[in-house]
């Protein structure tokens, strides 16, 4: 009986330790990821009733960027009583953990500012981030990029505040938003020079560790890696002939 009791105690301790270890790994790889109210509240916010820009150049620039998300399946509307809308099956599940071939541009940069904008027809919403580049790892875009320069990057989703005071959160399943003041390796695409760079995916660099921004299973393979080792491995991959 004594040995059975000892065995049960040992198994209980083992189960507790395993649960702690799994929870620790989950926190390491998914910290700051969607599903947390505080994190949702950090997403860029725009007003549904935002006035039109009066400067013709700024208005033309914003309309050129906003046309990408017209006729959005988000169907942003003030009469929608829901708290959130999530678009599913929009992220390519076959995307490699390091999508260097799929990216025009790969940079290390710090997020300086974030804003949300409605599409031209107000059916969609997207978030735009101003990035200060620390290091250009790849650039096949027509725009020359140098360390220290500023660029705008964007991705679909954001929060919209209606005149009633109601705030609706619009997201793409398994995609998250970078946070102001944080440093990331960004994998970017762009098809039109009038557009901001589009975030394919990104990895946050924090405390000399790597944290995937998005939630596809293959991205977790990079979670917790040493920052220097991660960047060096990425450079090697980028310099390897395809």
Regions found by a protein language model. Give the residues of each.
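Transition segments tied to proteolytic processing and entry into folded domains
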Residues: 2-242
